[in-house]
Amino acid sequence: MCFDIDSSPPVPAIAGASVSHELLKLRAADGNELAAFLATPDEPGRTGIVLLPDVRGLYHFYEELALRFAERGHAAIAIDYFGRTAGSSTRDDDFEYGPHVDQTTDDGVQADTRAAVEHLRGLDAGSIFTVGFCFGGRASWVAAASGHGLSGSVGLYGSPTRQRGGPSAVERGA
């Protein structure tokens, strides 16, 4: 992990910013139901951000980060990776994510990412980006080469050359 479980995003909240947020369930094309946290500015912009968390999946850090993006005019949705193995309910800070991470696949993570991208497109987000951290950083690079029609991808602490049971992001893009 790149930071403690009780960390907050380094970007301060904008006092008085008008945003909406909700926990929701998305359905991927393969039938997986996944948890997601959506934050939208009350005056929608044209940019959407899919947040791809670290190995711990969806928790408060990424919910707060989605809110910070929305306060700055961007719709943001943070997804959870563990719908296939742990269900789509919310989990506490003591969640044992390790066994669930081991069961993820690139195809599953990308199906979930595509569901989030499509949800943002349904909100009229024209330019959509992925921003991922650690495990999600790698997933962000893979998303760039997976045909989601993204405007860009940012991977923080992720490796574009590491493989997880399939071609690496670099190989997918070749």
Where are these regions (language model features)?
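N-terminal cap/leader regions of alpha/beta-hydrolase-fold enzymes
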Residues: 1-174
